[in-house]
Amino acid sequence: MNENLFASFATPTMMGLPIVILIIMFPSILFPSSNRLINNRLISIQQWLVQLTSKQMMTIHNNKGQTWTLMLMSLILFIGSTNLLGLLPHSFTPTTQLSMNLGMAIPLWAGTVFMGFRHKTKAALAHFLPQGTPIFLIPMLVIIETISLFIQPMALAVRLTANITAGHLLIHLIGGATLALMDISPSTALITFIILILLTILEFAVAMIQAYVFTLLVSLYLHDNT
């Protein structure tokens, strides 16, 4: 195992060049289009998951919000697949990098805010000042609402980064403890190994849940601005 606890989060390189782009593009291979594979089990599962998720997320949207369906479904598939691939041994999880998550969160958030100011200008501006606010609290509330608006993409990115990173660190620590206890106390090592298996199963669920939460929050931001 790596001596450095955070070595697995370092950006991988090949011949001195970062290969993050190749890693990010790899999930697209896992979801081939139906033009190449017809009546394939993978395609059937993919379509069923997309339809189920789109029904849950997009029913609250109007016609303008429905135009984001393809983007949001692509987003949840991308984040979910990269999270799951990161659980494989000796692999790299791009979503543990805050810079990448900010690169996804900021443009999506900015797009929803832009739509709000473009199509519902008065309603978008009204969010900065709740109805019935006392006059002496108006400047403070405007500042607070402005800060809360700009914190939204940071919260999206930090939530995804923290949850995925914490899970990987726990797996790393428990895996290291299991190896260290094999020679000292095999019975204790067996217990920690069982805990490691259960934690890994939990991390598979967390990987999908975090992809769903990230996409759902973007969908809610979109709903507030359309």
From Swiss-Prot:
Q: Name one GO biological process term.
A: proton transmembrane transport
Query: Can you state which reaction this protein catalyses?
Result: H(+)(in) = H(+)(out)
- What InterPro entries does its record include? ATP_synth_F0_asu (IPR000568), ATP_synth_F0_asu_AS (IPR023011), ATP_synth_F0_asu_bact/mt (IPR045083), F0_ATP_A_sf (IPR035908)
Q: Which residues cross the membrane?
A: 12-32, 68-88, 97-117, 135-155, 164-184, 189-209
Q: Give the record's GO CC terms.
A: mitochondrial inner membrane; proton-transporting ATP synthase complex
Q: Which PANTHER family match?
A: ATP SYNTHASE SUBUNIT A (PTHR11410:SF0)
State the similarity comment: Belongs to the ATPase A chain family.
According to its UniProt entry, the function of this protein is described as: Subunit a, of the mitochondrial membrane ATP synthase complex (F(1)F(0) ATP synthase or Complex V) that produces ATP from ADP in the presence of a proton gradient across the membrane which is generated by electron transport complexes of the respiratory chain. ATP synthase complex consist of a soluble F(1) head domain - the catalytic core - and a membrane F(1) domain - the membrane proton channel. These two domains are linked by a central stalk rotating inside the F(1) region and a stationary peripheral stalk.
The molecule here is called: ATP synthase F(0) complex subunit a
